[in-house]
Amino acid sequence: MTETEEVITLVDEEGVEHDFTVIDIIEVDGSEYAILLPMEDECEEAIILKLTHDENGNELLVDIEDDEEWEKVADAWEEMLAEEEAD
């Protein structure tokens, strides 16, 4: 798990900006995923996006479109949280 919390701004389909805190970057099956918490929402529900790179090597965050992949990453994140709480 990463120890630094970074704030990023993402733009939705309507062009509205939303700020998120990057609470972790995890690796599952050789791919990296960002765990984000919305800053403006009171809910504690995290958002998971896949970390990829464009043709110029710039980092991109993209939706996980495969349900099985999303479940695998969500399960890995929940396991990490449970291990931390047990410590």
From Swiss-Prot:
Family: Belongs to the UPF0473 family.
Protein name: UPF0473 protein PTH_1066
Organism lineage string: Bacteria, Bacillati, Bacillota, Clostridia, Eubacteriales
Superkingdom of origin organism: Bacteria
Species whose genome carries this gene: Pelotomaculum thermopropionicum (strain DSM 13744 / JCM 10971 / SI)
HAMAP family assigned: UPF0473 (MF_01448)
InterPro entries per record: UPF0473
